[in-house]
Amino acid sequence: MPDPKIVIGVTDCSKYANYSSWILAHGHNVEVVQLSAARNNLSDIKVCNGIVLTGGEDVHPRFYNRLDLYEYCYKDDVSEARDEFELRILEHTEANAVPVLGICRGLQIANAFFGGTLIPDIPRWGKFNHSKLPDDTDRYHTVQVDPDSWLHRITAQKEGRINSNHHQSADVIGNGLVASALSPDGIVEA
């Protein structure tokens, strides 16, 4: 009898095809389900063995109780419908012990879900620019991996090099979460 398929739910974003291809390239027995507020398919998470929360729009400050920070968001790049949808996904994953990988915005919405806050605009907080370069290419920098973190146990690395394309970041870390890797200016990257 063949092994059952592993079903991974991936939240919709402009680079959904990249995320889906990445997952499908790592196993013949994997299926990807596209999850999105626009599709209104929250019920599809019931068949998912894992979830990838992808990058994308800014997380609205109301979801981390800091409405006073809305002025720092990119107004044309906020989707409260997506925020609400992904928070409902996190309610399900938390209640059902479903693993989650949060990438960029995914990390940020998860931090908000667990009671953390965000830096809404990294450069205005006195940190270096983590967005794309002026020619629209990715920016790269090093990260320091916490030696006591799960990330360090998996990778056995003290330092890494990552691409960086975000202007929001975790600030106060949510309950039960750990900042596993920091950029040289102290921005949470994992």
Regions inferred by a protein language model and the residue ranges of each:
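N-terminal beta1-alpha1 cap of cysteine-dependent amidohydrolase-like domains
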Residues: 1-101, 111-119, 123-161, 167, ...
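Hydrophobic, aromatic-enriched interface-forming segments
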Residues: 107-109
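Conserved G/P- and acidic residue-centered "switch" motifs that form tight phosphate/ATP-binding loops
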Residues: 104
